[in-house]
Amino acid sequence: MPLPAFVAAAARLAVLVAAAATAANAASYARYRRRHLRRIPSPIDESADPLADFRAFPSSDADDSEEDNFFFGLATAPAHVEDRLEDAWLQFATETSCDDNGNVRDQRPVDALMASAAGDGGSQQSWRSTGGENIGDREQRKPLRVAMEAMLRGFEILAESGESAGGDNCSHNVAAWHNVPCPQERLRFWSDPDAELKLAKETGISVFRMGVDWARLMPEEPTEELKSSVNFAALERYRWIIQRVREYGMKVMLTLFHHSLPPWAGKYGGWKMEKTVTYFMDFVRLVVDRVSNLVDYWVIFNEPHVFVMLTYCAGAWPGGDPNAIEVATSTLPTGVYNQALHWMAIAHSEAYDYIHSKSKNERKPIVGVAHHVSFTRPYGLFDVAAVALANSLTLFPYVDSICDKLDFIGINYYGQEVISGPGLKLVDNDEYSESGRGVYPDGLFRILIQFNERYKRLNIPFVITENGVSDETDLIRKPYILEHLLATYAAIIMGVRVLGYLFWTTSDNWEWADGYGPKFGLVAVDRANNLARKPRPSYFLFSRVVTTGKITRQDRMSAWRELQQAAVQKKTRPFFRAVDKHGRMYAGGLDRPIQRPFILRDWRFGHYKMEGLQDPLSCFIRCIFAPFSRQKKIHYIEDDVISYSIN
């Protein structure tokens, strides 16, 4: 065949393949949109006042009328708040990536970094960056895009090219940690829990979620006699703190594993190894035997799939350090992802049985899991498969494996993630938290409905075990609280049994690999002034909702109007996520934030409008058919002060 003819034939074949691929992806998106992106018909009457009254719905079948009430709470974790804690996170934060000569260490052939924020808001790997660095400074980092990246919501595998210079190129595992006062003291919850407990109680909440750190109780691997490896004084201190929670009139929700693996377990492989189940059960028995009469709700594992992804698949958290082969094969049936989750599921089942067999409470213990869920959607036509595959790995598998050992399913929800290629897209006209999580209250409603449909045959109730937003300005947080509570209320109206709602968190604290950058607290903390606390306006708004059980039209309107005025005035606020020239967010935090404007968009519950796919091809097709569309192109957002339009 002559060369011109061969080239022409190859070109025709390429066009046919491209057309077929486009058609297939378009069909997939059409199905996905019908199932997941249709406008929510809100069951809330927005002309009513109050808009929501949580006291109108019983949360349980208990005989005690007090137990029938929907409960509000606040949540935290040992690694975030406890001082005098020699845990894996402190070791991780104080490590340097440079050797004694100032040369950058490279412990792995490639670093697998997860771009998805996952849990507790700051659950992302630090990019080991200095604040405000220019994207041009990252030119030596070359992304190697592989299939696994899309499967795990934006894994981005990066290899370092070129030689590293010493000195200024040295970096840290945890952002916004080395540049703040007394970072290792966290919030001094160990030495002075009353500072936090008093603030929590004064909001009016009835449930306080806290944790017990495994490494504090078992600082050494129990290879011989268990007693020789246990810090019994620490166990008694935990019992005293839990008693203090109850003395403040709050019930206790106790987490047994919250993203903190003992350093000694990390050395041998942690949850990749069966013996970790045995060690964990030693820890569980210690805690249950000593404090079960003081605990009302138990969370055995917090976000297990997030911990496994970031530790064993990505090597982004302490206790992991996978090699290139482990990274590449991590999501195969025999890979480390399924392997570690398998042992964690077994540990959950054994812990569940032990708690129920040994509980000293008169009433049956309530034991569950805190499961992280994001609402994910595709940015472009060819991102649908990545979203579907990510959900297939993270949405239901772990809960499915333990659903016969659950008294409640805890939902940790922070927002939405827009997937574009190998990472997460920063959508220009969407509002985001400081840590890069898209604000989308409708997503919580969608998730609750979806989970209820899957597990309603088991009659398992739900608890919102975490929901919060990093926002130092407090302008986003106030409507964020109200709109997510309205989403929860709407789900209850639709028949979802939700026992309660816990906000993350009381005071600004250490947010995993993001350090002290993102501000999640209802209370601001002045780290340079002996950790002085100052309640933000959202603290008092949250307290008003908690004490009355109601969301009023006035509160909603005032919170929204204040945020929109800031957007109209083009005010800016801190943003702790680096973004490349294509609008994709880097996986980790910054030591110092960049500034991002508030966004003019109506993201209130039941108001958010999906604009469709935003890749160039989809936009081009939409432009062609726009003259024939009857859909309104202007969405109006109105209240008694502001009226403006968004094209």
Swiss-Prot record:
Location of this chain's protein in the cell? Plastid, Chloroplast outer membrane
What glycosylation sites does the entry record? Answer: 169
SUPFAM superfamilies, per the entry: (Trans)glycosidases
- Compositionally biased intervals (Polar residues): 123-132
Q: Does the keyword Ribonucleoprotein apply?
A: no
> Sorted alphabetically, which Pfam families does this protein's record hold?
Glyco_hydro_1
Region (Disordered) location? 116-140
GO biological process, alphabetically ordered = carbohydrate metabolic process
The UniProt record lists the EC number as 2.4.1.184
Catalyses: 2 a 1,2-diacyl-3-O-(beta-D-galactosyl)-sn-glycerol = a 1,2-diacyl-3-O-[beta-D-galactosyl-(1->6)-beta-D-galactosyl]-sn-glycerol + a 1,2-diacyl-sn-glycerol
Q: What is its main location?
A: plastid
Indicate which residues the UniProt annotation says bind a beta-D-glucoside.
258, 302-303, 414, 466, 504, 511-512, 520
Q: Which residues participate directly in catalysis?
A: 303, 466
What does the UniProt keyword field contain? Chloroplast, Glycoprotein, Glycosidase, Glycosyltransferase, Hydrolase, Membrane, Plastid, Plastid outer membrane, Transferase
Q: Record's InterPro entries?
A: Glyco_hydro_1, Glyco_hydro_1_AS, Glycoside_hydrolase_SF
- UniProt GO cellular component terms: chloroplast outer membrane
Keyword hit for DNA-binding: no
Q: Which GO terms describe its molecular function?
A: beta-D-fucosidase activity; beta-galactosidase activity; beta-glucosidase activity; galactolipid galactosyltransferase activity
Q: What else is known?
A: Rice SFR2 is able to rescue freezing tolerance phenotype in Arabidopsis sfr2 mutant.
Function field: Galactosyltransferase synthesizing digalactosyldiacylglycerol from monogalactosyldiacylglycerol in the absence of UDP-galactose. Potentially involved in freezing tolerance.
What name does the UniProt record give this protein? Beta-glucosidase-like SFR2, chloroplastic
Its gene name is SFR2
